Amino acid sequence: TVVEAFEERYEKEQITQPRQIDGKFGQNDLKESVLKKVDLSKKLDRETYEKKLDELQKKLTLLHSEIYAKRIPVVLAFEGWDAGGKGGAIKRLTRALDPRGYTVNPTSSPNDIERAHHYLWRFWTKMPKDGHIAIFDRTWYGRVMVERIEGFCTTQEWQRAFKEMNQMEQQLVNHGAIVIKFWMHIDKEEQERRFKERQENPDKQWKITDEDWRNREKWELYEQAVDEMMVRTSTVNAPWVIVEGNDKLYARIKVLETVVDALEKRLDHNE
């Protein structure tokens, strides 16, 4: 009966309680950590940074016009550690873009309307029109990070999310979109330094919350979750780009270079 069907579904989809470290979290086929192999010593001096920044932003301005003319949509997804430099990188990108041709979509906890839909719905509705750029400051990958670790979704939900997100991105690519996903990576010591700097600067105190400090206590869990996420969702058509972010100047230039290179390659291919 209909009632029995509902009861059976309810039993299968019980929301789990926030999970604890039990020795099983993050057990997967990874032989070594993706993040721990990243060289965070990479740096850029201010003079080189300013020169590259000017060159890349001028290129990006022209490329933005070209992708608009050719109706190519672009999705730029930013994830990373708290205080990892997402906002700074996005700011240097958008300064080169025509305001009429892009949107920046900050992602926070879903509201009541969003919770009433499939978790990807709120992201699908913000995907770019042809020829436009959509930038996401945090993304659908929260499903396999914060929602997984804090118990905001069931085990079945986050496990199947890898395939669902790959499929969504492939659909965008099939439509002609360029999809690039950035992980802004810093080490735990650099994060602590930036947190303290924010606390001590009245102009930046709004950027730091008690939740940010609590999340640091689960650094190792997040690291395991990110490693698995990278391996299972970095594809040829929608790759993850790990940005070495301990040096902000280096990180901003790497993001710009990655976007410029991707747009140039697509436009060359289309000619």
Regions found by a protein language model. Name each.
Residues 1-271:
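Glycine-rich phosphate-binding loop of ATP-dependent small-molecule kinases
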